[in-house]
Amino acid sequence: MRASRGFTLIELMVVMVIISVLIGLAVLSTGFASTSRELDSEAERLAGLIGVLTDEAVLDNREYGLRLERDAYQVLRYDEAKARWLPVARDSHRLPEWAELTFELDGQPLVLAGSKGEKEQKKGTDQPQLLILSSGELSPFRLRLAERGPEGRALSLSSDGFRLPRVEVARR
């Protein structure tokens, strides 16, 4: 009887095919769906933030607001002693470079500032577009979070002023 000393060519080819298929699946699963998943995550994060701010506004009897830009948003709170809006955190939350926000207040589209240069020009107008009141009410709004470009996916958050926003797939 003859002892076998190694693998046959067929066995090596089968292993190579299996490894190739697994690498291909790994590349596909991380490459194409990552922006879609990240968009979902950003929309859920924003909806959750609005929900938490609504609860905090009622519990602390304090007014909150969201200052929106095309590529970022920032939480503000109203300081009654100073009679102005102050940022809760030092920096605003930046969206990924492939994402952008659009905003409608009471059915009217608002033009959002886009870059830091535009923001610095309007430094005195640090008013929030979305109000979260201590009564538990919100400004009636529709916010659209989308991938830039004509084929990009878009998600929508909206509220009639009394209900918390839900994330929905937006129509292009």
UniProtKB/Swiss-Prot annotation:
Biological function: Component of the type II secretion system required for the energy-dependent secretion of extracellular factors such as proteases and toxins from the periplasm. Part of the pseudopilus tip complex that is critical for the recognition and binding of secretion substrates. Type II pseudopilus confers increased bacterial adhesive capabilities.
GO biological-process terms attached to the record: bacterial-type flagellum-dependent swarming motility; protein secretion by the type II secretion system; single-species biofilm formation
Pfam families: GspH, N_methyl
Chain positions listed as propeptide in the UniProt record: 1-6
The keyword Transcription is assigned to this record: no
UniProt similarity note: Belongs to the GSP H family.
Organism: Pseudomonas aeruginosa (strain ATCC 15692 / DSM 22644 / CIP 104116 / JCM 14847 / LMG 12228 / 1C / PRS 101 / PAO1)
Membrane topology: Single-pass membrane protein
Protein name: Type II secretion system protein H
Subunit structure: Type II secretion is composed of four main components: the outer membrane complex, the inner membrane complex, the cytoplasmic secretion ATPase and the periplasm-spanning pseudopilus. Forms the tip of the type II pseudopilus by interacting with XcpV, XcpW and XcpX. Interacts with core component XcpT.
Residue numbers of N-methylphenylalanine PTMs: 7
Processing after translation: Cleaved by prepilin peptidase. Methylated by prepilin peptidase at the amino group of the N-terminal phenylalanine once the leader sequence is cleaved by prepilin peptidase.
SUPFAM superfamilies: Pili subunits
